[in-house]
Regions:
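Transmembrane alpha-helices and adjacent helix-loop boundaries
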Residues: 1-220
Length: 220
């Protein structure tokens, strides 16, 4: 017999795990996109050293496991005198990881804008800033929005990795509950359902945002 009711007393811990998972996901996405924007600009820069450095960063991060990157930040940095809490180390590692993927997504968006479109904007008397905002930025965001939405969901699922360093997100909470109740099936089934609700909820939210911002605006 399954005993899901026995997990009710841990609802507070589960809620805290959900909140930390969401917090890590949102802050990581913001920081990662900021890093990614800088790297994407470097990748498309006419200055070769910048392009080389940016490419090395992207290739190094995208071709090594997130868990290894996390361990370098949490266990490696203390050896040079930099000691971080589990949550801070998780945020830094996830942001660095997201930065590499975000850079490639943003670069693809910028490169999807043809030079003729920019030239047309300038010929209409738009300033460089207005051209970037109206001719480059909005179409680029529209082109990469689905990829960014999917990347957010992937980052949210990837937060489960940070339980390996003791960050008390959702998966770590599940391990704690399992160790107290020995109800492994019930615990991980509940956590699986929690992740499913979160991911489907955010996918629906992103789809609604896309419709209101891009589809509805164009129809007007």
């Amino acid at each position: 017999n399954f005993r899901f009711g026995a997990l009710w007393r841990f609802r507070g811990q589960i809620l805290e795990g959900v909140l930390l998972t969401l917090q890590l996901s949102v802050v990581t996405m913001i920081c990662g996109l900021a890093i990614g924007l800088v790297v994407a600009m470097a990748r498309t820069s006419p200055i070769q050293p910048l392009r080389v450095i940016a490419r090395i960063y992207v290739e190094a991060i995208r071709n090594t496991p997130l868990l290894v990157q996390l361990f370098i930040v949490f266990f490696g940095l203390p050896s040079i005198g930099i000691k971080l809490s589990a949550n801070t180390a998780a945020l830094i590692a996830l942001s660095i990881n997201m930065g590499a993927y975000g850079a490639e997504i943003l670069r693809a968006g910028f490169e999807s804008i043809r030079t003729s479109q920019v030239e047309a904007g300038r010929s209409l008397g738009l300033t460089a800033g207005q051209t970037f905002r109206h001719v480059v930025l909005f179409p680029a965001i529209k082109a990469i929005y689905p990829a960014l939405a999917s990347q957010f969901v992937l980052i949210m699922l990837a937060t489960s990795v940070v339980s390996s360093i003791g960050a008390t997100e959702l998966f770590n909470t599940a391990a704690f509950i399992d160790s107290r109740t020995y109800l492994s099936f019930e615990t991980y089934a509940l956590i699986t359902a929690s992740y499913l609700v979160l991911t489907l909820g955010f996918r629906a939210l992103f789809a609604a945002i896309y419709w209101f911002v891009f589809v509805r605006r164009v129809r007007r």
